[in-house]
Amino acid sequence: MTVQPQTLKIRRPDDWHIHLRDDEMLSTVLPYTSEVFARAIVMPNLTPPITTVASAIAYRERILAAIPAGHKFTPLMTCYLTNTLDVNELTRGFEQGVFTAAKLYPANATTNSTHGVSDIPAIYPLFEQMQKIGMPLLIHGEVTDAAVDIFDREARFIDQILEPIRRQFPELKIVFEHITTKDAADYVLAGNPFLGATITPQHLMFNRNHMLVGGIRPHLFCLPILKRSTHQDALRQAVASGSDRFFLGTDSAPHTKHRKESSCGCAGVFNAPSALPAYASVFEEMNALQHLEAFCSLNGPRFYGLPVNEDFVELVRVPFQQPEEISLGNESIIPFLAGQTINWSVKA
């Protein structure tokens, strides 16, 4: 019988995809990330979106001001690509160290993406410059054609959009974000070292049956949407393989309770409070704890060309129960796995 480890010591992880929002929401959710993660790629889909160096600097300052005392955390800012973005602004932001990467949202693919790109080949000059200067492109990989079934939008994106981009710009660093399908996992595994992918805890732990059978569970609704179990299994196999193409990106995306539990609920899962223990539980189930540190702490920095973190965090086999909800002024946020117990805790 295999003896289960009681503690796991790994280099401090980074979150390569997060939504921190702004104002009171920012100050409420940020500590759950800054307590555990050293760095995070911060999504730019505010209202209005982050499209200039000045707006990115201002947002970064608001984030830094919200970090609790004693937390060491660095927000890595991103530029929201639009049909009319100035290539010089993009270049200046990257060369000044303000923008770590640029984010491609196909128009209307997800929350606050109405300003996204409606004609992707039209912004190929931006991709050409990004390839030249070594700036990573982060992609929400779904087509938005209303005629395409929501469960097929990621797979269709690979053929219609991602493959042509990669053929045209073979040395452009691309992160295929929050992948949800076997198609995407296989595509990344078959790709070259310029292609990586993030995977969320919810897509590793759940499939669409969990969201839809026995009643609709709106707090599992995110985009890209949870897929069938065969896709979930493929994602689990991908992270358990130890491939360095995959790394941690929670896509933690908080919304207030009433915006989730409504007749037209928002997409997004607020998983920051439980993310690292949730990932550990998946890797343990897959008998792959030996690959947890690389997924959480090594693969991402190496893809981005950044140093790995020097300090460590410890996970201990002490069950902890997620709160049912988290206060936000007069409202609340329902966290991922609300009220449920996870077998791992991050040691304070």
From Swiss-Prot:
Broad enzyme group: hydrolase
Residues modified to N6-carboxylysine: K103
Natural source organism: Yersinia enterocolitica serotype O:8 / biotype 1B (strain NCTC 13174 / 8081)
Pfam families registered for this protein in UniProt: Amidohydro_1
Cross-referenced InterPro entries: Amidohydro-rel, DHOdimr, Dihydroorotase_CS, Metal_Hydrolase
Binding site for substrate: H19, L20, R21, N45, H140, L223, H255, A267
Residues noted as binding Zn(2+) 1 in the record, renumbered to the chain: H17, H19, K103, D251
Record-level GO cellular component terms: cytosol
Gene3D superfamilies, per database record: Metal-dependent hydrolases
TM ranges: none
Top-rank lineage group of the source organism: Bacteria
This protein's name: Dihydroorotase
UniProt family annotation: Belongs to the metallo-dependent hydrolases superfamily. DHOase family. Class II DHOase subfamily.
Cofactor note: Binds 2 Zn(2+) ions per subunit.
Keyword Metal-binding appears in the UniProt entry: yes
Gene: pyrC
Pathway in which the depicted protein is active: Pyrimidine metabolism; UMP biosynthesis via de novo pathway; (S)-dihydroorotate from bicarbonate: step 3/3
Positions annotated as active site in the UniProt record: D251
Oligomeric and partner information: Homodimer.
Cofactor(s) required for function per UniProt: Zn(2+)
Coiled-coil positions: none
Known function: Catalyzes the reversible cyclization of carbamoyl aspartate to dihydroorotate.
KW Zinc (keyword) present: yes
Binding site for Zn(2+) 2: K103, H140, H178
UniProt catalytic activity: (S)-dihydroorotate + H2O = N-carbamoyl-L-aspartate + H(+)
EC number(s) from the headed UniProt entry: 3.5.2.3
Molecular-function GO term, any one: zinc ion binding
